[in-house]
């Protein structure tokens, strides 16, 4: 396929693509963020990343992705609210026909902005919390005002007719209070609540020993969640509780992103295109939207084709009868834990490196690291990490 970008009004799409369409576009607008969450999935060296894409460059990305079949866009970061052109980007995404999501901490959000985003056509707002009580929330966020701001904005989102979607990242320091978390969500009249146990990428991987819950903590938390689900169902209550367990307590890997470069496409603040938001850490030269069309990136680039299909797989994945279900698991996790992204995801009990996972489980039983001892995601720490790498 040619490297020349096709005409904007008539992009070439293979009649029967060998891969899926990029249905889900994650627009990481910025790595700037007022919070310092120690489980952030942003790269450790975010402080040395390049200049952010301009408004016009994001318009081009969205148009090309939409013409290729992308249906849903998530505006993320960092904190996307620091971008002064966010309402413009939302309006353009709506004009192009995207279903639009704003994934935010709520810091920097105001009622005036909510109204402006509604007018621009925003479909969905997800607000994240760090904990159910102010002290722990603010300690994890690195901000003394974060909790009060989040509460106020969650209520404002509901007031202006959006479905209330709340996200709580749970870990060993807050998971034992999952009942309080759910009660807070019900008090805020949440429609959907994602109780997402920490996934260990980026800063969370760096802090894994201090964040990974024990097996007993997870079992109790899921039992409490199921009790609330039963109560809500009996009351015909509309709130839906989604409980996400960490990979580290599974015996089979997830079908990460439904397969490498299959439906999901991330564009980072500097324009680097990735098949998942954690892939930047790999020793692979990924394409940039400043230099290539989205068409070329998705279908022709080495980075997006590197782990498509099954031919790249070594054993035990190559001969495994489950490979079409899980695609060998997460490539980023394989790279982080074994140093080779082509290895089987160590989460899988068939992996030759599964002992790394069982060792992490054992370490969680005796871990003593406090919140204060975690490495917080901020510019200073990022620069130190970048300097030492």
UniProtKB/Swiss-Prot annotation:
SMART domains, per the entry: Elp3
Known catalytic reactions: [PQQ precursor protein] + S-adenosyl-L-methionine = E-Y cross-linked-[PQQ precursor protein] + 5'-deoxyadenosine + L-methionine + H(+)
GO MF annotations, alphabetized: 4 iron, 4 sulfur cluster binding; cyclase activity; iron ion binding; oxidoreductase activity; S-adenosyl-L-methionine binding
One Pfam family per UniProt: Fer4_12
Enzyme class: oxidoreductase
Highest taxon in the source lineage: Bacteria
EC number(s) on file: 1.21.98.4
Pathway note: Cofactor biosynthesis; pyrroloquinoline quinone biosynthesis
NCBIfam families recorded: PQQ_syn_pqqE, rSAM_more_4Fe4S
Family to which the UniProt record says this protein belongs: Belongs to the radical SAM superfamily. PqqE family.
Quaternary structure note: Interacts with PqqD. The interaction is necessary for activity of PqqE.
Purpose: Catalyzes the cross-linking of a glutamate residue and a tyrosine residue in the PqqA protein as part of the biosynthesis of pyrroloquinoline quinone (PQQ).
Protein name according to UniProt: PqqA peptide cyclase
Source species: Pseudomonas syringae pv. tomato (strain ATCC BAA-871 / DC3000)
Gene: pqqE
């Amino acid at each position: 396929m040619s490297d020349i970008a096709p005409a904007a009004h008539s992009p070439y799409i293979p009649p029967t693509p060998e891969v899926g369409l990029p249905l889900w576009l994650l627009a990481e607008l910025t790595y700037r963020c007022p919070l310092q969450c120690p489980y952030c999935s942003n790269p450790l060296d975010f402080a040395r990343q390049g200049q952010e894409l301009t408004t016009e460059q994001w318009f081009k990305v969205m148009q090309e992705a939409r013409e290729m079949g992308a249906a849903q866009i998530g505006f993320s970061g960092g904190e996307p609210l620091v971008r002064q052109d966010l309402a413009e980007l939302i309006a353009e995404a709506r004009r192009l026909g995207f279903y639009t999501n704003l994934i935010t901490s709520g810091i920097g959000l105001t009622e005036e902005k909510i109204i402006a985003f509604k007018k621009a056509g925003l479909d969905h707002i997800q607000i994240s919390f760090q904990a159910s009580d102010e002290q722990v929330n603010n300690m994890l966020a690195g901000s003394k005002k974060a909790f009060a701001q989040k509460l106020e904005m969650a209520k404002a989102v509901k007031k202006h007719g959006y479905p209330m979607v709340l996200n709580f990242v749970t870990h060993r320091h807050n998971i034992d209070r999952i009942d309080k978390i759910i009660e807070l969500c019900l008090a805020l009249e949440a429609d959907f609540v994602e109780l997402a146990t920490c996934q260990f990428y980026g800063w969370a991987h760096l802090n894994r020993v201090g964040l990974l819950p024990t097996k007993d903590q997870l079992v109790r938390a899921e039992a409490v969640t199921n009790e609330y689900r039963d109560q809500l169902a009996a009351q015909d209550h509309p709130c839906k509780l989604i409980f996400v367990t960490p990979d580290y307590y599974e015996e089979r890997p997830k079908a990460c992103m439904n397969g490498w470069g299959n439906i999901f496409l991330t564009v980072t603040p500097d324009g680097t295109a990735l098949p998942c938001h954690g892939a930047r850490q790999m020793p692979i030269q990924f394409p940039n939207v400043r230099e290539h069309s989205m068409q070329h990136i998705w279908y022709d680039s080495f980075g997006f084709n590197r782990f498509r299909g099954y031919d790249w797989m070594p054993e035990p994945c190559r001969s495994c009868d489950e490979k079409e279900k899980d695609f060998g698991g997460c490539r980023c996790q394989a790279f982080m834990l074994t140093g080779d992204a082509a290895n089987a995801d160590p989460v899988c009990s068939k992996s030759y490196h599964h002992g790394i996972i069982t060792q992490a489980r054992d370490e969680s039983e005796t871990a003593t690291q406090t919140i204060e001892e975690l490495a917080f995601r901020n510019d200073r720490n990022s620069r130190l990490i970048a300097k030492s790498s």
